[in-house]
């Protein structure tokens, strides 16, 4: 971790505190471009928006993919108060962001707050492989 990383992680934690102060879940994130400037920042708004996907990491990944050119996205770092959940990690991966730096790991979170970690939803499959793959053949991401 560099001194710049530490500064930006502290900002992510401050955004998490601001989110908590507003009655939202205490998570905050920001994007820092290749030149070291803050490009965007956000905090959790799940309760205010009535949107279970309104995590700051998810919102910022969508913003980056929509608003920035590919070269800038790939050279941009996301700083976040907690390690992104699987939903947000998927969005970050798809957005093309180049790096994520987090303060609290998912393991640390689960150890400290075990009751708040929901059990996984059972998933079944794979089924109907030939039909499913026929739709995907030839599709380029």
Q: Where are these predicted regions, by residue range?
A:
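Short beta-strand scaffold segments in enzyme catalytic cores
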Residues: 27-36
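A short, polar/acidic, helix/strand-boundary loop motif
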Residues: 2, 46-47
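Small-residue (primarily alanine) positions within well-ordered alpha-helices
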Residues: 12, 16-19, 29, 40, ...
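A short, polar/charged loop-to-alpha-helix boundary motif
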Residues: 48-58, 63
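Short, basic and Ser/Thr-rich N-terminal targeting/leader segments
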Residues: 23-27, 72-74
């Amino acid at each position: 971790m560099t001194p710049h990383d530490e500064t930006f992680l502290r900002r992510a934690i401050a955004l998490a505190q601001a989110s908590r102060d507003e009655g939202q879940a205490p998570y905050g994130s920001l994007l820092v471009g290749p030149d070291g400037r803050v490009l965007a920042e956000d905090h959790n708004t799940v309760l205010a928006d009535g949107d279970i996907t309104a995590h700051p990491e998810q919102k910022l990944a969508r913003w980056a993919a929509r608003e920035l050119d590919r070269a800038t996205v790939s050279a941009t770092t996301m700083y976040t108060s907690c390690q992104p959940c699987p939903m947000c990690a998927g969005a970050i991966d798809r957005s093309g962001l180049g790096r994520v730096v987090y303060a609290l790991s998912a393991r640390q979170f689960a150890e400290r707050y075990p009751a708040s970690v929901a059990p996984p939803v059972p998933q079944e499959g794979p089924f109907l492989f030939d039909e499913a793959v026929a739709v995907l053949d030839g599709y380029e991401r």
